[in-house]
Every structure is written in structure tokens, then in C-alpha cells.
Amino acid sequence: MTSPSSARIHAQQLSLMLVTDSLACGERSLPEVVAAAVAGGVTCVQLREKLASGHVFLDRARALRQLLKPLGIPLIINDRIDIALAAQADGVHLGQTDMPVADARRILPPTMLLGWSVETPAQVEAANDLDVDYLGVSPVFATPTKTDTAPPWGLEGLSRARRLTVKPLV
């Protein structure tokens, strides 16, 4: 099945995605950091709050939604469909161990974006048959901010992923 992603998002809106959480902000507030990133050219924001309670995560998501909606910048919520729906976010991003894509798509409104993390070329190929709007190729390089990752793809791996799918890659 080919994703009707063109109806939900333009690839240009995914050209520079900020993936952040409140812990990455240091002394500054999350909205302050996100606003500065958008002013610097960020075209999409993914909120990851792995350590926050549901209440706190929802409050942060709503604050970012209020900031981003007037600017036309999509807000994607990491892992939590419930938070994405309650905050009226533009989408949700799921990893390999999260809810299956088909189940998520059944729950989500048809206009809501669905991103999926891929860690191997086989997963990229499998994604061609899934109703996802974009793929998160993770990680391209080693990172200290996320330690539970597969080995880095590197630039050659990223190039290979690009050849395996027409879906937008982030």
C-alpha cells in the first residue's frame, strides 16, 4: 500500500526536523528553544519526552502546539498516540517496538501524520507497504542523546535508504 502522504504533508515541511525534549533545553524553556529553532529555519518539531509523566508531556505538547500552529510548523509527538490526539498535534512518530503501524493508522484521524523509525534496509523496504508519511532513519551518526539505537547508518547507509524508498526520510 502506498501512503497518501502527499495529502498529509509536503516533503519540504520535513526538511529540517527538530527532535527535542525539555531535558535538552538546559536553562531555557522548551517553548523558548523551539521558537529559536523555528526562527533559525526548523520546518517541523518532534517532541520526545521519555521521562515526563503523561500530564507533563501533554502540557508541554499543548504549549508547543499553541506556539507552532500559527506558524504553520507541524508538531509530531514521539511514541504517544494519546498525547498526540489530546494535544491536537499534527502527527505521531513510532519506533520499531511501539504500536504496529497498521493499528496506529486505524486509531489516528486520516489527516494525522505517521512517521516510523527504521534501523535496517529491510525495514526501509517493508515501509514501502505501510501507510506511513515519512521514515526516521536512525541513527545516521552516533549520538549521546539516544543510547538505545542500532549501529549508525553513516552517509553510505543513508544513501542506500534513499534508493530503497520514495517516502521522505528524516
Give the predicted meaning of each segment.
Residues 141-143:
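A short, flexible beta-alpha/helix-coil linker loop
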Residues 1-101, 106-134, 150-156, 160-167:
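Conserved N-terminal beta1-alpha1 strand-loop-helix module at the mouth
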Residues 145-147:
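Glycine/threonine-rich flexible loop motifs
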Residues 170:
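Conserved active-site loop/cleft motifs that coordinate metal ions or position small ligands
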